[in-house]
Every structure is written in structure tokens, then in C-alpha cells.
Amino acid sequence: MQSVVFVTGNANKLREVQDIVGNALPMLTCHQLDLPELQGTTQTVSIHKAKTAAAILKTPVLIEDTSLGFVALNGLPGPYIKWFMESVGHVGLNAMLHGFDDKSAFALCTFAYCEPGHDPILFEGRTDGLIVHPRGPAGFGWDPIFQPCGFTTTYAEMDKDLKNSISHRYKALALVKEFFQSKSDLALHS
């Protein structure tokens, strides 16, 4: 099976994907590509990024887009979480929910696989949780303020293996792995 290029410039994201998928994907290589970010839903952004990357690189690509939605704010900041983090940080994100009793949130991860000239295939994983005051190391985005439902720790406080077995990214990648396994099975029977 042909190799797949994972388009990211985020070393933490690449490491986490590799930790989760192991060798389940066909020869996953990495390439940083500065892609224009559309405004829209995570799905719209993912489709556009995947089509653009596949056309530029002329090879199958896998891209990922993550959003963090606050229920009290109808899903904001959503796919704009990266810019909110850069602008206001953990404290500012918490302040956005000041005055709201509802601190519930959801983390959504969308992977898009695209071959040149084809429509992307989307894979989504979602984890519900709460927005809390920052706890744990601040090394990976909004992990210190997101506490998944059923846990008393934030993503940042969790052991890496635990986080990688319950996260929104894990759930989406489980679907990606399933897709590539079925693709591999079809190739074996052809």
C-alpha cells in the first residue's frame, strides 16, 4: 500500500498520533505544509485542507483538525481554539465561561484522508468533559483546562497512555485504523 503523508507542523500532535496508531497505518510520513485556514465547521476546514494538501503534494494525505466547544457558548471557540489559545490562553478561556453555570465542553477531532483528485473521507472522535481551571503541565494546547467526563484529572494531568486511550484523537484514529485495515484487506483479496 502507498505511503500516506500526515500533514502537520505540530510535533506534539505527530508524536501523539504515532503513539496511538503504532504501525497500523501504511508508512505514515510527516510533512509541514502551510495551508490556508478557512472559516467554518471543523468538517469544512478538514475537507478543504485535505483536498488542497493532496493536490499540492500529489500523494495521499491525512490531515487533522481539532476543536474545543463550550456548550454555554453554542460550541465556540470550536475550530478557532488555536487562535483563542494564542490570544487569551488558559485563563482567558476560563474567563469566557464566567457568569455561566454550564462549564461543559466537548473536544472534537476530525481526520480527513484524501487521495489526489478524490473527495476526502472524514473520521471524527468526540470526548465530552468540563472546562476547569488550569491543572497539569502546559505543554500541549488546552489539555490543562479540559477534564473528560468520568475523570477527576485534566488531559494534562493524565498519564500519556491513559490520555491516548480515551481522547477525542484516539476515537477518531480508531476509525482511521479501521478504514486502513479494511483497505488492506480488500487489496489482499484482489
Curated annotation (Swiss-Prot):
Its EC number is 3.6.1.66. It is found in: Cytoplasm; Nucleus. The keyword Oxidoreductase does not apply. CDD domains: HAM1. One of its GO terms (molecular function) is nucleoside triphosphate diphosphatase activity. Mg(2+) binds at residue 37. Binds 1 divalent metal cation per subunit; can use either Mg(2+) or Mn(2+). InterPro entries: ITPase, ITPase-like_fam, RdgB/HAM1. Keywords: Cytoplasm, Hydrolase, Magnesium, Manganese, Metal-binding, Nucleotide metabolism, Nucleotide-binding, Nucleus. It catalyses: ITP + H2O = IMP + diphosphate + H(+); dITP + H2O = dIMP + diphosphate + H(+); XTP + H2O = XMP + diphosphate + H(+). Its cofactor is Mg(2+); Mn(2+). One of its GO terms (biological process) is nucleoside triphosphate catabolic process. One of its GO terms (cellular component) is cytoplasm. Its main location: cytoplasm. ITP binds at residues 8-13, 49, 65-66, 82, 140-143, 163, 168-169. Gene3D superfamilies: 3.90.950.10. PANTHER family: INOSINE TRIPHOSPHATE PYROPHOSPHATASE, INOSINE TRIPHOSPHATE PYROPHOSPHATASE/HAM1 PROTEIN. Belongs to the HAM1 NTPase family. Pyrophosphatase that hydrolyzes non-canonical purine nucleotides such as inosine triphosphate (ITP), deoxyinosine triphosphate (dITP) or xanthosine 5'-triphosphate (XTP) to their respective monophosphate derivatives. The enzyme does not distinguish between the deoxy- and ribose forms. Probably excludes non-canonical purines from RNA and DNA precursor pools, thus preventing their incorporation into RNA and DNA and avoiding chromosomal lesions. Homodimer. This is Inosine triphosphate pyrophosphatase. It comes from Batrachochytrium dendrobatidis (strain JAM81 / FGSC 10211).
